[in-house]
Each structure stands twice: as C-alpha cells, then as structure tokens.
C-alpha cells in the first residue's frame, strides 16, 4: 500500500483491536486483527484474518468513487457523491416526520422510470499482479549483487513501524503514536 501511494513515512497514530478467536492454541498474537492508521492525509484501515482464504484487496475510496486493486484486476467503481437512498439516520425520527422526509426525498430524487443513471465502471485484468515473488527476487538479487533494491532501508523501516505500532496498540488496548525524537512508540 505504501509503495502504491508513494508514501515513505510511518503512520502518525495507530489503533488496533482483535482477539484469538480461531486458534486458541497458546499463541499471544490475535488471529483476527484490525487496525486504523492515521497517515495525516488519509485514514487507512487494515484487517488481518488468519485461517481463511480471503483475497488480498486494496480499496481506495475517494470523492469520485472506489478503486479496488486485487491480485488479478484493478477496478474503478464510480460514485456520484449524491445519496442514492433516503438517509438511514431517519430511523431515529418520529414516525410522522420520517414519513414526510422519505416522501419528500423520493419526490425530489427518484429518477424517471427508464431514465435511471448508469454509472460505468472499468476493470483491467492481468494474469497476476502478485508482487511477492518479484519483490523477494529483487531483494535477494540486490543483496547478492550489491545493487539498489526498489525501496531503501528507510522505506522498509517505516513499513515495519506500522506493523509494530499495530501490535503495540493491540497489547496496550489503546491508540499509539510514533515519537521520532525518542525513536519509541508511545501511548496516545
């Protein structure tokens, strides 16, 4: 993800939760682990589930839609930024107010039958964009031949810091921040 976005910095903050749900075999690391990272310009949510064959998917959500990157495809799902249904917050409204809001919303927003807008998405498919084998190959060739690898040690350190912050947050049961001045992970 950091490579795709061109980021070369550790997250400013991380908050994790998780549990040992599938493999209660004495391990101390969660097999279900979710973390929300604050990189300053964008929040990043990362989920790790051990013991299931879920595909690796990156989803980037923006004001124009969603870009989904998988091993075999890159797909763009356009979104207009406009509501496609009445607000779900109305369930807390009194019944009379809710009914009036829903009726008004449909009167103002429902498309004319046969004139519903169609948002066209795009999908680009390939054999496999799995970068693990090429990544490891470039690394070992770089070490063996004393050549520059794709990313430098600072990039690797920053990526590893995100993992360490996630784990520290899980064990502390609170948000953590990276203190660059002291070179330590601290509770937020």
Task: List the predicted regions and their residue ranges.
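Stable alpha-helical structural segments in soluble proteins, enriched in small hydrophobic residues
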Residues: 131-135, 162-173
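Hydrophobic, well-ordered secondary-structure elements that form the walls
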Residues: 139, 156, 173
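Rossmann-like dinucleotide-binding domain that binds NAD(P)(H)
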Residues: 1-43, 50-53, 154-157
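C-terminal substrate/ligand-recognition segments
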Residues: 151-152, 156, 163
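C-terminal glycine/acidic-rich active-site capping loop/insertion
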Residues: 2-6, 25-39, 59-151, 176, ...
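Short, solvent-exposed aromatic-acidic interface loops
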Residues: 49-51, 80-81
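Short beta-strand segments
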Residues: 44-46, 56-58, 176
């Amino acid at each position: 993800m950091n490579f795709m976005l061109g980021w070369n910095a550790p997250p400013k903050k991380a908050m994790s939760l998780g549990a040992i749900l599938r493999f209660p075999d004495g391990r101390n690391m969660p097999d279900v682990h979710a973390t929300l990272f604050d990189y300053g310009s964008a929040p990043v949510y990362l989920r790790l589930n051990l013991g299931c064959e879920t595909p690796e998917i990156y989803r980037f959500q923006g004001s124009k839609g969603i870009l989904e990157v998988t091993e075999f495809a890159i797909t763009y799902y356009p979104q207009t930024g406009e509501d496609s249904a009445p607000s779900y917050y109305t369930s807390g409204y009194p019944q009379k107010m809710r009914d009036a809001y829903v009726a008004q919303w449909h009167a103002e927003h429902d498309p004319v039958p046969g004139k519903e807008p169609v948002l066209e998405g795009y999908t680009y498919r390939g054999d496999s964009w799995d970068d693990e084998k090429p990544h490891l190959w470039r690394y070992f060739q770089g070490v063996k031949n004393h050549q520059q690898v794709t990313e430098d040690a600072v990039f690797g350190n920053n990526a590893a810091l995100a993992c360490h912050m996630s784990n520290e947050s899980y064990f502390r049961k609170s948000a953590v921040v990276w203190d660059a001045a002291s070179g330590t992970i601290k509770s937020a």
